[in-house]
Amino acid sequence: FQIFNAGAAIAALRALGKDQAACEAAVTSAFWPARMQRLRFGPLVEAAPEVELWLDGGHNPAGGAAVADTLARMPARETHLICGMLNTKDVRGYMHPLAPHVTRLHAVSIPGEKNTLPAEATCEAATAVGIKAVTAASVAAALTQIVADCPTARVLICGSLYLAGGVLRENG
């Protein structure tokens, strides 16, 4: 979906008379926080220095498919999700494309969000689409569980822009 957005932006730049160099600069310098964003500093990274830590706010089937495509292109590595979602989303639709790429999902509730899907329900949805899943009290607790099992895992915190925003605020 980001390719379509980039295409629209390039079309707008061309309509404004911008040259190819301006279009290339615009696309290559674009940054959207919490869209497969690598976390490289902060308390979460310090708690798991050997973990490859990522953050993505996708929360619908198209977002799940985009993340799955990205994971499929990455070098092989044990991959864990820390996932919190809203009760208004198609949780199974989001998770289904991720199933082949995930070692385990650690389900969390989204702190302070009244429409959070309880971690237990997120866990059940993951299990229903073939993902091994457990619950955790928080993102930090899930990360601690993951590091204890596989200190060099790839970890993707995902499932909600609300969860992603909270992680960015708390992680610095």
Language-model segment annotations:
Residues 1-104:
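Nucleotide phosphate-binding/pyrophosphate-handling subdomain across enzymes
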Residues 163-165:
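Short, active-site-adjacent cap segments at secondary-structure transitions
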Residues 14-15, 49-55, 95-154:
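C-terminal helical cap/extension that packs against the catalytic core
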Residues 160:
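Active-site-proximal loop/hinge segments that shape catalytic or ion-binding/gating pockets
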